[in-house]
Amino acid sequence: MPQAVAGPEIERLIQLLGRMPGLGPRSARRAALQLIKKRETLLAPLADAMRIAADRIVVCHACGNVDTSDPCTICRDETRDPTTLVVVEDVSDLWALERSGAVKARYHVLGGVLSALDGVRPEHLTIALLVERASAPGVKEIILALNATVDGQTTAHYVTESLKPLGLTITRLAHGVPVGGELDYLDEGTLTAAIRSRTAF
């Protein structure tokens, strides 16, 4: 076990930062040092923001987004298209779509994907709530914005079957060549998906 190089408070900060996705021990140490160096301009404001977030953040009972109000800002936004529900795996996917500005609809966060390997079954996700929301008067289209993984595809098929009796239009995001992508660098699966979902130019 490596020897501690600082007091227990700093070691705890490094440990906690190291639990963040994408931050290993070395990156956590660097981040902790940056926070310590910029104590007044970064560490103190960050600590305040985290304290406030811990006290006020809630999960929206309607869509599953995280916000400081329930229903969330998106669900309360009356300018959004009430006829369309965009289904995503996680809040991070919802935020990515919002950053793109490509859709001005309402969302539904499943809370994950079906996975036999990880033991995630339909009752572990918010699929029943999705069916209930999709049954509401005025809903016409469900956009499946799920990741193009095996578990994502399995979940998309299950959700489609669950919603089929409602007679709604069910669409999914196109798969294929990313903007700025070069064909030579793409895998065969991506190229196949791009060919199959080609559109008129």
Swiss-Prot record:
Disulfide bonds: none
Pfam families assigned: RecR_C (PF21175), RecR_HhH (PF21176), Toprim_4 (PF13662)
Biological process (GO), any one: DNA recombination
Keywords associated with the record: DNA damage, DNA recombination, DNA repair, Metal-binding, Zinc, Zinc-finger
Signal peptide: none
Superkingdom of this protein's organism: Bacteria
Zinc finger residue ranges, C4-type: 60-75
Keyword Metal-binding set for record: yes
Domain Toprim: 83-178
Family: Belongs to the RecR family.
Function per UniProt: May play a role in DNA repair. It seems to be involved in an RecBC-independent recombinational process of DNA repair. It may act with RecF and RecO.
Protein name, UniProt field: Recombination protein RecR
Species, as recorded: Methylorubrum populi (strain ATCC BAA-705 / NCIMB 13946 / BJ001)
Gene: recR
